[in-house]
From Swiss-Prot:
Similarity section: Belongs to the frataxin family.
Natural source organism: Klebsiella pneumoniae subsp. pneumoniae (strain ATCC 700721 / MGH 78578)
Transmembrane residue ranges: none
GO cellular component, one term: cytosol
Function, in words: Involved in iron-sulfur (Fe-S) cluster assembly. May act as a regulator of Fe-S biogenesis.
UniProt protein name: Iron-sulfur cluster assembly protein CyaY
Keywords: Iron, Metal-binding
Pfam families in alphabetical order: Frataxin_Cyay
Single Gene Ontology MF annotation: ferrous iron binding
């Protein structure tokens, strides 16, 4: 994958997250902000999830209260380089824990 393809795929990921949060109709307040390639999800309790892109490695990084995760694109899924879990699974787990209710992105 070249840099422009990586950015296109990361932009698509960011857009999907933003669209899902715009459609969020849960009880807790969840906000999303994109600034300079970093996506920040803020929760009502003050906690945050930070998602950023690591262009030199062509990875997406996810920082949550539970820890940090690095994802490589394998096929059409972003996969954690340590656990083998998908980006969406880990994001949904973290967002649900931090929101105090189930949050789905897919």
């Amino acid at each position: 994958m070249n840099d422009s393809e990586f950015h296109r795929l990361a932009d698509s990921l960011w857009m999907t997250i933003e669209e899902r949060l715009d459609d969020w109709d849960g009880d807790s307040d969840i906000d999303c902000e994109i600034n300079g390639g970093v996506l920040t999800i803020s929760f009502e309790n003050g906690s945050k999830i930070i998602i950023n892109r690591q262009e030199p490695l062509h990875q997406v990084w996810l920082a949550t209260k539970q820890g940090g995760y690095h994802f490589d694109l394998k096929g059409d899924e972003w996969i954690c380089d340590r656990s083998g879990e998908t980006f969406w699974d880990l994001l949904e787990q973290a967002a649900s824990q931090q929101a105090g209710e189930t949050v789905k992105f897919r």
